[in-house]
Amino acid sequence: MSNTGTTGRIPLWLVGTVVGLLAIGLLALFFYGSYSGLGSSL
């Protein structure tokens, strides 16, 4: 496993962290919307 993919690019751990936070945020918004009745129409 060479480390050439991260050269001059965003580190993979940072990408994973951002994607994870976005996924958790979207899930939180979806559950909050469905709980408050805003997401019941989806």
Curated annotation (Swiss-Prot):
GO cellular component terms attached to this protein's record: chloroplast thylakoid membrane; photosystem II reaction center
SUPFAM superfamilies to which the protein is assigned, alphabetical: Photosystem II reaction center protein J, PsbJ (SSF161021)
Keywords: Chloroplast, Membrane, Photosynthesis, Photosystem II, Plastid, Reaction center, Thylakoid, Transmembrane, Transmembrane helix
Keyword Cell wall biogenesis/degradation: no
Compartment(s) of residence: Plastid, Chloroplast thylakoid membrane
One Pfam match: PsbJ
One annotated GO biological process: photosynthesis
Membrane topology, record value: Single-pass membrane protein
Transmembrane segments: 10-30
Function: One of the components of the core complex of photosystem II (PSII). PSII is a light-driven water:plastoquinone oxidoreductase that uses light energy to abstract electrons from H(2)O, generating O(2) and a proton gradient subsequently used for ATP formation. It consists of a core antenna complex that captures photons, and an electron transfer chain that converts photonic excitation into a charge separation.
Assembly with partners or alone: PSII is composed of 1 copy each of membrane proteins PsbA, PsbB, PsbC, PsbD, PsbE, PsbF, PsbH, PsbI, PsbJ, PsbK, PsbL, PsbM, PsbT, PsbX, PsbY, PsbZ, Psb30/Ycf12, at least 3 peripheral proteins of the oxygen-evolving complex and a large number of cofactors. It forms dimeric complexes.
Family: Belongs to the PsbJ family.
UniProt cross-references to HAMAP family, sorted A to Z: PSII_PsbJ
Name of protein: Photosystem II reaction center protein J
Organism annotation: Mesostigma viride
Record gene name: psbJ
